[in-house]
């Protein structure tokens, strides 16, 4: 649903085994993938072997950033932003991550972040936190977790504001971004009774 065109370049940070890479490659002029794992990157390369517009780099974003010579129309962080403190060793790793990737945006480019909502409905309904598998860990603001964290809408909005002058649009996939049944936005929030089942 992103309006990516064949004239645009995409940087996919945290591409993993490539579940999104092929879709991006079919829409974009080129896709540059970065992932920490050589094994996941090998799977991605095999999975998308028929896409001649995909380049895969293995390593931490900090380590491969200097090799990025292009500007990108879209930079995606799908299930990755929550791990920024492991990649960026600063006092404000999430703010710094956005500042660093913004340097690689083309004029008018967009950053796309898909991340769990720390206060999401599924956690209130009794699901364990996606990353650490503990009940209420995110709802209680991660008292026992240091390596990963997700944010409420307000917290994420504050991080984005601190990082720079970004124009933001929030979307709300239900029940989550991994397997959305419906995607809401501030222009179209759920009506009474829509969140059943």
Identify the meaning behind each predicted range.
Residues 76:
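A conserved beta-strand element that flanks and buttresses the S-adenosyl-L-methionine
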Residues 92-110:
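A short glycine-rich, Lys/Arg-flanked "PGG" loop and its adjoining helix->strand segment in the class I
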Residues 169-196:
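Conserved catalytic loop of SAM-dependent methyltransferase domains
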């Amino acid at each position: 649903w992103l309006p990516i065109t064949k004239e645009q370049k995409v940087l996919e940070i945290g591409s993993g085994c490539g579940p999104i890479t092929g879709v991006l490659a079919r829409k974009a002029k080129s896709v540059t993938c970065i992932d920490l794992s050589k094994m996941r990157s090998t799977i991605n390369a095999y999975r998308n072997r028929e896409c001649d517009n995909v380049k895969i780099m293995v390593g931490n974003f900090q380590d491969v950033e200097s090799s990025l010579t292009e500007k990108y129309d879209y930079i995606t962080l799908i299930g990755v932003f929550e791990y920024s403190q492991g990649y960026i060793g600063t006092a404000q790793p999430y703010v710094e991550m956005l500042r660093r990737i913004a340097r690689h945006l083309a004029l008018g480019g967009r950053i796309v972040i898909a991340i769990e909502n720390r206060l999401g409905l599924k956690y209130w309904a009794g699901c364990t936190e996606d990353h650490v598998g503990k009940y209420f860990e995110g709802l209680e603001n991660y008292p026992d977790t240091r390596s990963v964290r997700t944010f409420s809408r307000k917290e994420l909005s504050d991080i984005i504001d601190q990082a720079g002058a970004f124009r933001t649009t929030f979307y709300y996939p239900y029940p989550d971004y991994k397997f959305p049944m419906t995607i809401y936005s501030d222009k179209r929030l759920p009506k009474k009774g829509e969140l059943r089942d």
